[in-house]
Amino acid sequence: MSTNLKYLSLGILVFQTTSLVLTMRYSRTLKEEGPRYLSSTAVVVAELLKIMACILLVYKDSKCSLRALNRILHDEILNKPMETLKLAIPSGIYTLQNNLLYVALSNLDAATYQVTYQLKILTTALFSVSMLSKKLGVYQWLSLVILMTGVAFVQWPSDSQELDSKELSAGSQFVGLMAVLTACFSSGFAGVYFEKILKETKQSVWIRNIQLGFFGSIFGLMGVYIYDGELVSKNGFFQGYNRLTWIVVILQALGGLVIAAVIKYADNILKGFATSLSIILSTLISYFWLQDFVPTSVFFLGAILVITATFLYGYDPKPTGNPTKA
């Protein structure tokens, strides 16, 4: 049963991530009158929707009893403040990570950023080994290096996207490099820390998601105030929201649920493979649907490497020992 849940959750993650990337890109490029929706508010709304969905799932698990739901939420969240506070750590790190990536993109050319940020694949594996005592074989380590290289090639910017590296000073590039490296390590740690909490405590994945969403909403609202406070006060929190925006928000909320399920029934490393495959899929669909991307030979090379790495990670060489004779 757990194996079926593992592959089902990974398959849904590929579908969800691909759909989210395409709809988000389309929603941000669609030309409409009036102000565009703010991504910072969309993040907060997605967190709130995720909390609501998790409460409904806990309600369903409680045999649709409001009294049982109230007791579970009270016992598992309010009566266990230290357990709830544990989720403030990954939530805060994710917020820090988003800010670090903004700093990195402001101080690095696109190619350096994309290649360096793929180190998060290896940092996730390293934290999985050190924090969860996960054992990886030679083929699995090799597949992770191939995956990292493949994703870097797939996301390699086109000539029109590249910045002139001469315009960036050495000091600026150092700041950008330190920011992206810190983001890589924080991403790996936060993901594995959340996995450790999910797998080593008795609380359900839905309760943990409610706790994570609570802190995510708080940090998200802080982001809205800091980055888009003026725009919100001028045009409102839901400025620019339309049917497509709500689809994006719902897909983001679904992503939080699916990722938690993947981490619970699979692991962060397999999540990285699923996300990498969705990058290829969304890019190819974008080429045929949005027609805003032209695949290059570097992209196809990267796609081949990602697919090869995926199969290599699951390769389990059988020992060919000779039977001993009596």
From Swiss-Prot:
Membrane topology: Multi-pass membrane protein
Quaternary assembly: Interacts with SLC35A2; the interaction is reduced in the presence of SLC35A4. Found in a complex with SLC35A2 and SLC35A4.
Alphabetic keyword roster: Golgi apparatus, Membrane, Sugar transport, Transmembrane, Transmembrane helix, Transport
Family: Belongs to the nucleotide-sugar transporter family. SLC35A subfamily.
NCBIfam families: nst (TIGR00803)
Location of this chain's protein in the cell: Golgi apparatus membrane
Coiled coil: none
Membrane keyword on record: yes
Protein name per its UniProtKB record: UDP-N-acetylglucosamine transporter
Keyword Oxidoreductase among record annotations: no
Gene Ontology MF terms in the entry: UDP-galactose transmembrane transporter activity
UniProt function note: Uridine diphosphate-N-acetylglucosamine (UDP-GlcNAc) transporter in the Golgi apparatus. May supply UDP-GlcNAc as substrate for Golgi-resident glycosyltransferases that generate branching of diantennary oligosaccharides.
GO biological process annotation, one example: UDP-N-acetylglucosamine transmembrane transport
Bilayer-spanning residue ranges: 8-24, 42-58, 138-154, 174-190, 210-226, 247-263, 269-285, 296-312
A cellular component term, taken from the record's GO annotations: Golgi membrane
